Design a protein with these regions (language model features):
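Preference for protein termini
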Residues: 1-375
Length: 375
C-alpha cells in the first residue's frame, strides 16, 4: 500500500512512494505501461505546446531563451541521414609517410568514382546562432519546437546537451530520434482528422543552467486543476524528495495557481518545473496531455479517468481533489537504467556492423577529432 500524507494543513497532498513492479499499470522495469488515454488529444493542443507559443506568456518564470527560424535547407540537412559531417568544419590535409600502410590505403581510394562528402554551409544561419549563443553567455541548451535531443546526449564529447557552437547542435540533432519525430511526425497520436496546422520550425536556444535531476518534476493538469506531480528522474532515489514531499508539493501548487492556472491556452496539459535550492520554482517546458508525453510514475489511464488518484480517501478528503497526488521513488527500489539507454545504438552504427556504410564511420571520427582540436 503506498504511503500517503495524513490529512490536514500539512497533509493535503497525497504522497506516494513508488515500488517498481508493484503498482497497477506498471511492468517489472518500473516504466508506466503505455495506455491509450480515454481523452482525445487534438492537433491544436500539440500546436499550443510549441515553445514560441508559450514562451512569450511565461518568459518571466522560465529560463532566458532565443528563438530562431529554422531555414528549409537546414531542416533538409537535419533529415539527411547520409552523413554525419557537420558544416563549418575544415579538415586539415592528411599526409602519410612513404611506405606506411596509410599510403597504401590512400592508393586504394584513388579512384575516379570516389566522392568527397562535404557538408552544406549555412553562413547566415551560422552567424545568427553564434550571436544568440554569445548573448546567452556562451553555452546553450538546444531544442526544436517541442523536443530536445535528450536521447542523443551520449554522442557529445562531454556526454551533455551543453552546446557552444552550431556544430555541437547539429551533432545532437542529427543523432536524435526525438528531433526527427518533431520534424516528421509532430501530430502522432492525435485523434482528430482535421488538417495539420501550418508550422514554422524554429531552433530554440536556452541559456545553459546546471540543473540537478533530483529537482525536476512533471506536473499533470486536467480541466485546469493540478491532479498529479511526478519525480522526473524516477530511475533514482533522492532522499530530499522523500523527506520534503509536502514542502515540494506545496511550492509547486502555489506556483501553478499564481503563474500557470488559467493562463495556458488549453485546460488539459503537462508542464515541467525545476525547484532550486532556495525553494523557488521555475517553469521548464509544456507538453501535450496525452500519450506522446511520458507519464513517468503515473499511467495515462489513471490521469485521464481519475482512477487510483483518490485511493482510499474519505468523502471529505475526496472533495479536496484540488490538491495533487505526488509520486516519487522510494529507497527500496533497485537503481533503474536511464530510459534513454535504448537510443544509444543509431542505425548508422548498425549499418557499420553489417558493412553497409563505412563512410559514416569516417565522417563521425573526423567530427570527433575536430571537436577535440577545438577543445
Amino acid at each position: 500500500m503506498p504511503a500517503r500524507a495524513a490529512p490536514g494543513a500539512e497533509g493535503r497532498f497525497r504522497a506516494e512512494r513508488e515500488l517498481f513492479g508493484e503498482k497497477r499499470g506498471r511492468n517489472g522495469s518500473g516504466r508506466a505501461v503505455p495506455c491509450r488515454p480515454e481523452g482525445r488529444m487534438k492537433k491544436e493542443q500539440v500546436a499550443h505546446c510549441r515553445f514560441s507559443v508559450w514562451y512569450p506568456l511565461f518568459r518571466t518564470v522560465t529560463i532566458r531563451s532565443v528563438i530562431l527560424p529554422l531555414p528549409d535547407n537546414v531542416k533538409e540537412y537535419l533529415l539527411d541521414d547520409g552523413t554525419l559531417v557537420v558544416s563549418g568544419r575544415e579538415d586539415p590535409p592528411m599526409h602519410a609517410q612513404e611506405g606506411s600502410d596509410d599510403a597504401e590505403e590512400i592508393q586504394w581510394s584513388d579512384d575516379e568514382n570516389t566522392t568527397t562528402l562535404k557538408a552544406p554551409e549555412f553562413p547566415e544561419f551560422t552567424a545568427k546562432v553564434e550571436e544568440a549563443i554569445s548573448s546567452l553567455g556562451g553555452s546553450v541548451f538546444p531544442k526544436l519546437n517541442w523536443s530536445a535531443p535528450r536521447d542523443a546526449y551520449w554522442i557529445a564529447m562531454n556526454s551533455s546537451l551543453k552546446c557552444k557552437a552550431l556544430s555541437d547542435i547539429f551533432l545532437l540533432f542529427k543523432s536524435s530520434d526525438f528531433i526527427t519525430r518533431d520534424l516528421t511526425q509532430p501530430f502522432i497520436h492525435c485523434t482528430d482528422d482535421s488538417p495539420d496546422p501550418s508550422l514554422d520550425y524554429e531552433l530554440v536556444l536556452r541559456k545553459w543552467c546546471e540543473l540537478i535531476p533530483g529537482a525536476e518534476f512533471r506536473c499533470f493538469v486536467k480541466e485546469n486543476k493540478l491532479i498529479g506531480i511526478s519525480q522526473r528522474d524516477y530511475t533514482q532515489y533522492y532522499d530530499h524528495i522523500s523527506t520534503q514531499c509536502e514542502e515540494i508539493c506545496r511550492s509547486i501548487q502555489e506556483f501553478f495557481e499564481k503563474h500557470i492556472q488559467y493562463k495556458f491556452l488549453d485546460e488539459d496539459f503537462v508542464f515541467d518545473v525545476y525547484r532550486d535550492s532556495r525553494g523557488k520554482v521555475w517553469l521548464i517546458d509544456f507538453n501535450p496531455f496525452g500519450e506522446v508525453t511520458d507519464s513517468l510514475l503515473f499511467t495515462w489511464d489513471e490521469l485521464t479517468s481519475g482512477r487510483n488518484l483518490k485511493g482510499d480517501q474519505s468523502e471529505e478528503e475526496a472533495t479536496e481533489q484540488d490538491y495533487p497526488v505526488f509520486r516519487c521513488t522510494n529507497s527500496k527500489v533497485t537503481v533503474q537504467p536511464s530510459p534513454y539507454l535504448s537510443y544509444r545504438l543509431p542505425k548508422d552504427f548498425v549499418d557499420l556492423s553489417t558493412g553497409e556504410d563505412v563512410h559514416k564511420l569516417i565522417d563521425f571520427l573526423k567530427l570527433k577529432r575536430n571537436q577535440q582540436d577545438d577543445d
